[in-house]
Amino acid sequence: MEKRKIILDCDSGHDDAIAIMMAAKHPAIDLLGITIVAGNQTLDKTLINGLNVCQKLEINVPVYAGMPQPIMRQQIVADNIHGETGLDGPVFEPLTRQAESTHAVKYIIDTLMASDGDITLVPVGPLSNIAVAMRMQPAILPKIREIVLMGGAYGTGNFTPSAEFNIFADPEAARVVFTSGVPLVMMGLDLTNQTVCTPDVIARMERAGGPAGELFSDIMNFTLKTQFENYGLAGGPVHDATCIGYLINPDGIKTQEMYVEVDVNSGPCYGRTVCDELGVLGKPANTKVGITIDTDWFWGLVEECVRGYIKTH
């Protein structure tokens, strides 16, 4: 089986932690590095969260700090969902794990330029790191095999009626990525909201056990509370983990090719991913957009990854 080489670019909230856990353990994925961006919380907090997850699960992958601010807009955070730390819920041991000294954007550029065009970028937070890398060194564009991202929606947003948080947090960066010409796969809210993690799923992962089962439980029990308080949902969707699911087995997720444009005009639609689902604009599709996911398959995959952290010796 071919291992997909990926760089996981994240803002280290609750669903990001599940994505890290899956990407680092599944045999179909070769996780080269983790790059951190500001998003769910400020960069200092998202960096600590990423390092904490790696330390707890003994994930020996280099971690790089990236963009602390969006390209243009005023910074926003999602503390209503992810809490004051950006990863409220779990209690971690004192942190000894350290980030690399290289900036995430430089790491992305250098790694892609040295590659054979076989690396996939997996941004599951705001697209600031990816966009700045593209602008700093446009020669990386043909080197990117694919970008599989979590963000946007062809229906309703979750941070404004129009916009999903990751895109709204840096719409200008998203505009750069969506106009780059690189093959794009978008896991938007329409798809990711199908992965609502209800108490029975949490109990299933607790039964699976090990450090990842414990972390999953602590993370998703907190998310259960904030998702109900903010959106009335019966559980928290694990948005970002769907990107890892897609990379492991694209057949588990139905996609549709669409032309997608990011609205960067100020107003009520700022940050919206305008998806031409019906093809009325007549423009060539630039994105595969996630439509539906086989949730039985997906939770089975998550459990498989959780069990991978159980030590047998």
From Swiss-Prot:
- Output the Gene Ontology cellular-component terms: cytosol
> EC no.?
3.2.2.8
Q: Can you tell me which residues form the catalytic site?
A: D11
The cross-references to InterPro entries, in alphabetical order and at most eight, read:
Inosine/uridine_hydrolase_dom, IUNH, Pyrim_hydro_RihB, Ribo_hydro-like
Which UniProt key words apply to this protein? Calcium, Glycosidase, Hydrolase, Metal-binding
Q: Does the keyword Calcium belong to this entry?
A: yes
Q: Which residues bind Ca(2+)?
A: D11, D16, V124, D240
Short name of any one Pfam family annotated for the protein: IU_nuc_hydro
Q: How is the cofactor bound?
A: Binds 1 Ca(2+) ion per monomer.
* Cofactor dependency: Ca(2+)
Reactions catalysed: a pyrimidine ribonucleoside + H2O = a pyrimidine nucleobase + D-ribose
- Binding of substrate occurs at Q227, H239
Q: Which top-level group of life is the source organism from? A: Bacteria
Q: Name one GO molecular function term.
A: purine nucleosidase activity
The record's Gene Ontology biological-process terms are:
purine nucleoside catabolic process; pyrimidine nucleobase metabolic process; pyrimidine ribonucleoside catabolic process
Asked if the keyword Hydrolase belongs to this entry, the reply reads: yes
The UniProt family comment states: Belongs to the IUNH family. RihB subfamily.
The entry's function note states: Hydrolyzes cytidine or uridine to ribose and cytosine or uracil, respectively. Has a clear preference for cytidine over uridine. Strictly specific for ribonucleosides.
Q: How does it assemble?
A: Homotetramer.
For this protein, the record's NCBIfam families field holds:
PRK09955.1 (NF007417)
Q: What is this protein called?
A: Pyrimidine-specific ribonucleoside hydrolase RihB
Organism field: Escherichia coli (strain SE11)
